[in-house]
Amino acid sequence: MEMIQAVRGTRDILPQEVRLWQQVEASAREILGRANYQEIRTPILELTELFARSIGSATDVVGKEMYSFSTRGEQEVSLRPENTAGVVRAYIQHGLQVAGDVQRLWYCGPMFRYERPQAGRQRQFHQLGVELLGSRDPRADAEVIALAWDLLRAVGAENLTLRLNSLGDPQDRRAYRQALVDYLTPLKEELDLDSQERLVRNPLRILDSKDPHTRTIAEQGPKLPDYLSADSRAFFEQVQAHLQALDIPYELDPYLVRGLDYYTHTAFEIVSPELGSQSTVCGGGRYDGLVEELGGPPTPAVGWAIGLERLVLLLQKKQQEIPPTSVEVYVISRGAKAEAQSLQIAQALRQAGFCTELDLSGSAFSKQFKRASRSGATWAVALGDAEAAAGEVQLKHLPTGQQQTLLQADLVKYLVSQR
C-alpha cells in the first residue's frame, strides 16, 4: 500500500527540532512577560471578510494566497494568513479597548498561505507576534522594535539588520501612490508581469519586486519619504531618536512598504543575509486605522511578527542544537509480577520529579541494560519476579557500574538524597 505523506507545503517538526522551537518560545515568554505583554489565543478559522477588510482585497494575500471555503451554513471562512487582524477582531469583540488603557498582547501559532514552497516559506507556517494597541506615542514603536531585537539576539541570531521606513498617514500614501502610478504607467511594458498586474491593484508592492530590472526602474522613480507631511516626518524622526537612545542600529530603506494594506507610518523588517531570498525574519509596523476599519473606535496600534520557520532555519545554520531532556532513571523489569510493579515504580519516580523511562520491551535484562546505557540515564532500576516478591529493586549507577539492593519503599527517598 502506498505511503501517505504530508501535504505539499507542510512539514513535520520532529522531536530534535522541536527542542529548538521550545527554546525560542520560552525566551519569548520570558522577554515579553518582562514587558507585561499578555498572551492571546485566537481561532485559526476566521470569516473571510475580516481579511478582505484588513489586509486589503487587492493584496496578493487575499487575492491569491488564502485558503477559503464555504461552511454548511454558507459562511465564507478562511484559514488565517496572519494574526494581526484576528487579534484586533478579538480586541473589539471582547471590549478590551478600555478608555486610556494600552493593551500589550502576544501570540504564537500556525498561519496558512498558498505559496510556492521553498526553504523558509511553507504553506503552513508559524508566527510569533506582538500587538501594542492604544498608543500613538513613538516610544511604542521603539518598544516593540526593541523587544523583537532583544528576542532575536537572546536566542542566538546574529548578523541582523533592522530596515526602517515611514509610510506616512493615508493622505501621504495616496499622494505617493499617485506619483508612483504616474511614473510607472509609461514604463509598464518594461516591468515584470507581476508588477504590471500590481500597477493596477496595489502599486506600492512593485517596490518589493524581486525582479532586478523592475527594482532598477522603481528606484529611479519617486521616493516615499519625499511625500511625507511635516507631522509624519516629525513622528518618524522621534522613532529614530528613541532607537538611537536604545543603541539599536538601523538602516533607512525608502522602498520598504510591507505587503499588507493596513500599515501606516512606521514600517520595519529585521533581515539576515544568511537566509538568501527569504531574508526577512521579523516584519511589522504601525496600523493606526485598522481597529476603526474593523468596527472599533479609532485606536492607534503597532506590532510585528517573527517567522519561526525562518528563525529556526537561521539558528540551524549556526549548527545550534538543544540537547535532549536527559533521562535520569531507566526502569527495567522481567517477569509478569515485576512488569506490573515496574509501572508503579516509574510513576512514583515521575511524581517525585525524576525524568523516568520505562522499558516496555520485555526482552532479556542484558538488552534492557544496553538500552538504559544508550538513553543517557544515571540510574537503572531493575527487578525480576524475585525482587517483586521481596518488595525490592536492584539499583545500578550506570556511570560507575556500582549496584545495590534497595527496598522499593526506600527507592525514591534514596534517589532524592543522591541528587
Swiss-Prot record:
PROSITE patterns noted in UniProt: AA_TRNA_LIGASE_II
Q: Which UniProt keywords apply?
A: Aminoacyl-tRNA synthetase, ATP-binding, Cytoplasm, Ligase, Nucleotide-binding, Protein biosynthesis
Top EC category:
ligase
Q: Which transformation does this protein catalyse, written as a reaction?
A: tRNA(His) + L-histidine + ATP = L-histidyl-tRNA(His) + AMP + diphosphate + H(+)
One GO CC term of this entry?
Answer: cytoplasm
In the Enzyme Commission scheme, what number(s) does this protein have? 6.1.1.21
Q: Which GO terms describe its biological process?
A: histidyl-tRNA aminoacylation
**Claim: Transcription is one of the keywords in the record:** no
Identify a single GO molecular function assigned to this protein.
Answer: ATP binding
- InterPro entries to which the protein is assigned, alphabetical: aa-tRNA-synth_II (IPR006195), aa-tRNA-synth_II/BPL/LPL (IPR045864), Anticodon-bd (IPR004154), Anticodon-bd_dom_sf (IPR036621), His-tRNA-ligase (IPR015807), HisRS-like_core (IPR041715), HisRS/HisZ (IPR004516), HisRS_anticodon (IPR033656)
The similarity comment for this entry is: Belongs to the class-II aminoacyl-tRNA synthetase family.
**Complex formation:** Homodimer.
According to UniProt, the name of this protein is Histidine--tRNA ligase
- The species this protein was found in: Synechococcus sp. (strain JA-3-3Ab) (Cyanobacteria bacterium Yellowstone A-Prime)
Its lineage opens with: Bacteria, Bacillati, Cyanobacteriota, Cyanophyceae, Synechococcales
